[in-house]
From Swiss-Prot:
GO terms for cellular component: membrane. It holds the Pfam family zf-RING_2. Residues 308-318, 340-353 have a biased composition (Basic and acidic residues). This is E3 ubiquitin-protein ligase Os03g0188200. It is an enzyme of class 2 (transferase). GO terms for biological process: protein ubiquitination. It catalyses: S-ubiquitinyl-[E2 ubiquitin-conjugating enzyme]-L-cysteine + [acceptor protein]-L-lysine = [E2 ubiquitin-conjugating enzyme]-L-cysteine + N(6)-ubiquitinyl-[acceptor protein]-L-lysine.
């Protein structure tokens, strides 16, 4: 468009400059007849040449601009298609960033191992403690369903972890990338076996250091040591601190579940079989319970459990409650004999308590 405007401006300017001598010649009455006879239509040869040159230049500019527009339009669709594919299907690092921003697909999340905690607890080792969800910080009940992340073996409630995985591709607890292939079970078991051995070796070396340090102490050296090097006592307490830290690190993880792969497959198959059997009798109850209702039920059950623990603490704290005795007689509203029997039964009940 800019080329066309420039060409039109140049053409108009040249036409005006060419018509000025023609108008001046037509105003001269003496030479008008000579110019009309010299040129057909009243134009001089110079004017005709200029007009032909301008028209030719205008045509060339028009053709050139049309060719440029056609070439631009021919190249535009591949660029737009590339941009659209790049925005929706990026390659390399951009693809990972796009997946990280939009999370995992629902099919991928549903493919993660799931099982019922009651079945899992029966297969777990006796030394391992109860598991709990790292999102809601609630212990799993025997009837709760748990989802295991294959990259780190952390367990969560499906209603707690599914919204997170819809917007992220990492574990909310350890930030492990769930799009990467999971670590093999053999490597995980080998690391679990080597970790206690390293902890034992470290504790033995610390005990030897402490024993050698205590063996060098004498009453005189202790007095001199305490008078001149007070800050060195921190080193004596350092092995104890290291052992405390190692004991804390060796504490059981309440958010990790490590079972053999075939066991997880068996648990998942049992869960699917139970679910199919339960839905066979109730075809209308295929839809899952809403997440907000499940969360509300968990909070209510937690409050009930806290209230029951508080009542139990009050009961064991020293205040005794009088419970009815099975053998006590019921109250009868007739006569003094009934009053006497009532007092006797109450006194017997209090004595028994």
């Amino acid at each position: 468009m800019a080329h066309r405007r420039i060409a039109l401006a140049v053409l108009v300017t040249l036409l005006l400059s060419a018509f000025r001598p023609c108008l001046a010649q037509q105003s001269n009455d003496d030479t008008s007849k000579h110019h009309r006879s010299a040129t057909a239509g009243g134009f001089t040869p110079t004017t005709v040449v200029v007009l032909v040159a301008l028209i030719t230049a205008f045509v060339l500019l028009t053709v050139f601009s049309v060719l440029i527009n056609r070439c631009a339009q021919a190249r535009a669709p591949p660029r737009r298609a590339f941009r659209s594919t790049a925005s929706h299907q990026p390659v390399g690092g951009a693809a990972a960033a796009s997946r990280a921003s939009r999370g995992l697909d629902k099919e991928v999340v549903e493919a993660f191992p799931t099982a019922v905690y009651g079945d899992v607890k029966a297969r777990m080792a006796a030394k391992s403690g109860p598991l709990e969800c790292a999102v809601c910080l609630a212990e799993f009940a025997d009837s709760d369903e748990l989802r295991v992340l294959p990259a780190c073996c952390h367990v969560f409630h499906p209603d707690c972890i599914d919204p997170w995985l819809a917007a992220a591709v990492t574990c909310p607890l350890c930030r492990a990338n769930l799009t990467a292939p999971p670590v093999s079970l053999a490597a995980a078991e080998s690391s679990d076996l080597t970790a206690p051995e390293e902890a034992v070796q470290e504790e033995e070396s610390e005990e030897l250091d402490e024993a050698s340090l205590m063996a060098t102490f004498t009453p005189e050296s202790v007095i001199d040591f305490g008078a001149t090097h007070d800050h060195e006592f921190d080193r004596a307490g350092y092995p104890h601190y290291r052992r405390t830290q190692s004991a804390m690190d060796a504490a059981p993880d309440r958010h990790t579940l490590r079972l053999p792969e075939h066991v997880m497959k068996e648990l998942a198959a049992d869960r699917r079989h139970r679910r199919a059997a339960s839905l066979a009798g109730y075809p209308d109850s295929v839809e899952r319970t809403p997440r907000w209702l499940t969360s509300l039920w968990r909070s209510v059950s937690w409050q009930r459990q806290s209230r029951a623990d508080w009542d139990a603490g009050e009961e064991h704290g020293g205040s005794k409650r009088v419970h009815p005795v099975a053998g006590a007689q019921d109250e009868t509203p007739s006569g003094s004999g009934s009053d006497g029997s009532k007092e006797n039964s109450d006194s017997d009940a209090l004595n028994r308590v």
